[in-house]
């Protein structure tokens, strides 16, 4: 049961505050304890109940069931490791592949020092950081997509 206090619009103090831009909901219902103790748990438990119900009624399969008697031609890692796997697979020297994996975070650490003159947060006013981000995103998607192809088609993604 919510207790609502109606504003007295004839009060000169309230009219002065409203004239200065104070919101109309000044006399509204407080968030503590009403929302935090009653509304939020209902929403959280309802969401959990909905997710559990969907998982029980319609379970999603995670890939094909394992068959111990059929080995795939090429064993692939999880999807989020495809770019790393592709770098190690394409480069001829494995030490070079590991060095490339270490060079990626080191290169990202250098970006703030390269662009230290620029103090803006807007990406359109930070061309070096934006270019590094876009280049890294495109290369990561390209490597991740190429990891699913055979080794001879992996760099061209089977297009050429």
UniProtKB/Swiss-Prot annotation:
One annotated GO molecular function: ubiquinol-cytochrome-c reductase activity
TM ranges: 36-56, 95-115, 131-151
Gene Ontology BP term (one): photosynthetic electron transport chain
Keywords recorded for this protein, A-Z: Electron transport, Membrane, Photosynthesis, Thylakoid, Transmembrane, Transmembrane helix, Transport
Primary residence: membrane
Function comment: Component of the cytochrome b6-f complex, which mediates electron transfer between photosystem II (PSII) and photosystem I (PSI), cyclic electron flow around PSI, and state transitions.
Pfam families: Cytochrom_B_C
Record localization: Cellular thylakoid membrane
InterPro entries: Cyt_b/b6_C (IPR005798), Cyt_b/b6_C_sf (IPR036150), Cyt_b6/f_cplx_suIV (IPR005870), Cytochrome_b_C_euk/bac (IPR048260)
Domain of life: Bacteria
Membership in a protein family: Belongs to the cytochrome b family. PetD subfamily.
Membrane topology (UniProt): Multi-pass membrane protein
Upper taxonomic lineage: Bacteria, Bacillati, Cyanobacteriota, Cyanophyceae, Oscillatoriophycideae
GO cellular component term, pick one: plasma membrane-derived thylakoid membrane
Name of protein: Cytochrome b6-f complex subunit 4
Species whose genome carries this gene: Crocosphaera subtropica (strain ATCC 51142 / BH68) (Cyanothece sp. (strain ATCC 51142))
SUPFAM superfamilies registered for this protein in UniProt: a domain/subunit of cytochrome bc1 complex (Ubiquinol-cytochrome c reductase)
PROSITE patterns in the cross-refs: CYTB_CTER (PS51003)
Quaternary structure, from the entry: The 4 large subunits of the cytochrome b6-f complex are cytochrome b6, subunit IV (17 kDa polypeptide, PetD), cytochrome f and the Rieske protein, while the 4 small subunits are PetG, PetL, PetM and PetN. The complex functions as a dimer.
């Amino acid at each position: 049961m919510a207790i609502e206090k109606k504003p007295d619009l004839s009060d000169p103090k309230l009219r002065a505050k409203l004239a200065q831009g104070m919101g109309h909901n000044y006399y509204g219902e407080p968030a503590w304890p009403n929302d935090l103790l009653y509304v939020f748990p209902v929403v959280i438990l309802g969401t959990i109940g909905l997710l559990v119900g969907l998982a029980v009624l319609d379970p999603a399969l995670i890939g094909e069931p394992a068959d111990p008697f059929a080995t795939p031609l090429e064993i692939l890692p999880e999807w989020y490791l495809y770019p790393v796997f592709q770098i190690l697979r394409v480069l001829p020297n494995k030490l070079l592949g590991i060095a490339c994996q270490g060079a990626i975070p080191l290169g990202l650490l250098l970006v703030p020092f390269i662009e230290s003159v620029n103090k803006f947060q807007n990406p359109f006013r930070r061309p070096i950081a934006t270019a590094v981000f876009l280049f890294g995103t495109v290369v990561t998607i390209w490597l991740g997509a190429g990891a699913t192809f055979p080794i001879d088609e992996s760099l061209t993604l089977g297009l050429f």
